UniProtKB/Swiss-Prot annotation:
Domain of life assignment: Bacteria
Reaction catalysis annotation: uridine(516) in 16S rRNA = pseudouridine(516) in 16S rRNA
Any single Pfam family the record assigns to this protein: S4
InterPro entries according to UniProt: PsdUridine_s_RsuA/RluB/E/F_cat, PsdUridine_synth_cat_dom_sf, PsdUridine_synth_RsuA/RluA, PsdUridine_synth_RsuA/RluB/E/F, PsdUridine_synth_RsuA/RluB_CS, RsuA_PseudoU_synthase, S4_RNA-bd, S4_RNA-bd_sf
GO MF term (any one): 16S rRNA pseudouridine(516) synthase activity
An example Gene Ontology biological process: enzyme-directed rRNA pseudouridine synthesis
Stated name of the protein: Ribosomal small subunit pseudouridine synthase A
Keyword Repeat tagged: no
Listed CDD domains: PseudoU_synth_RsuA, S4
Species, as recorded: Pasteurella multocida (strain Pm70)
Family: Belongs to the pseudouridine synthase RsuA family.
Record function comment: Responsible for synthesis of pseudouridine from uracil-516 in 16S ribosomal RNA.
């Protein structure tokens, strides 16, 4: 890999900014100042910027995060902290979430630097299922299951929701599996049923389940088997 490309990918600098930094003698490769952006480097080289070691961040990052309440899934937000604060730089700048969660929703978020892979999760044509544990303000009523299975017309929408699966756990808790990602869909579905969501936790995307060994704010790499479920 070219040195200027490495700097751009691992520091957040643009390629032109990386070359300016090189001309300022701010970069060393294996202890020697290097000004040539075209210089080839590999993972065996020790590269430093202004004396600080720059780790290699390999392509092909696939992670699951246990998102806590109170965090947004965007890189920047003026009101709330972002989930990218849980990742070290420069990894945080390379990742994007494959589907977001609202600020007050907890649970599974998949993150990657592979746009094609995440597209298989977020694109409506792939009908990726997501399962949520939903806590309701009022008791569950028996007709909810049929209403979800048949689809319902949400306020402001012209087409009904696609069939969804509702599993009743107890009087106030259900698992809801949907294959769409409409704006605030889960909350709006239960509002249409005359109820209110007071707790929302996503625990499954496709075949990938949130690892119960993770605490809120923790993440781990996906296994090869988990990654492959969205490569089919």
């Amino acid at each position: 890999m070219r040195l200027d490309k490495f700097l751009a990918e691992n520091t957040g600098l643009t390629r032109s900014q990386a070359n300016k930094v090189l001309k300022q003698s701010a970069v060393t490769v294996n202890g020697h100042v290097e000004k040539n952006g075209a210089q080839k480097v590999s993972q065996t080289d020790e590269i430093c910027l202004e004396g600080e070691h720059l780790p290699w961040v390999s392509a092909g990052q696939y992670l699951m995060l246990y998102k806590p309440q109170g965090y947004v899934c965007s890189h920047e937000d003026g009101d709330y902290p972002t989930i990218y604060q849980f990742f070290d730089y420069p990894l945080a700048g390379k990742l994007h979430s494959a589907g977001r969660l609202d600020v007050d929703t907890t649970g599974l978020v998949l993150l990657t630097d592979d746009g094609k892979w995440s597209h298989r999760i977020t694109s409506p044509k792939h009908h990726c299922e997501k399962t949520y544990l939903v806590t309701l303000a009022d008791p569950v009523e028996s007709h909810y299951q049929q209403a979800c299975a048949e689809g319902m017309l949400l306020r402001g929408e012209k087409t009904p929701t696609k069939p969804a699966t509702l599993e009743i756990l107890d009087d106030y808790n259900v698992n809801l599996t949907i294959s769409e990602g409409r704006y605030h869909q889960v909350k709006r579905m239960f509002a249409a049923l005359g109820n209110k969501v007071v707790g929302l936790h996503r625990w499954k995307i496709g075949q990938i389940e949130l690892d119960d060994r993770l605490a809120e704010g923790e993440y781990r790499s996906l296994s090869a088997e988990e990654i492959a479920t969205f490569n089919k």
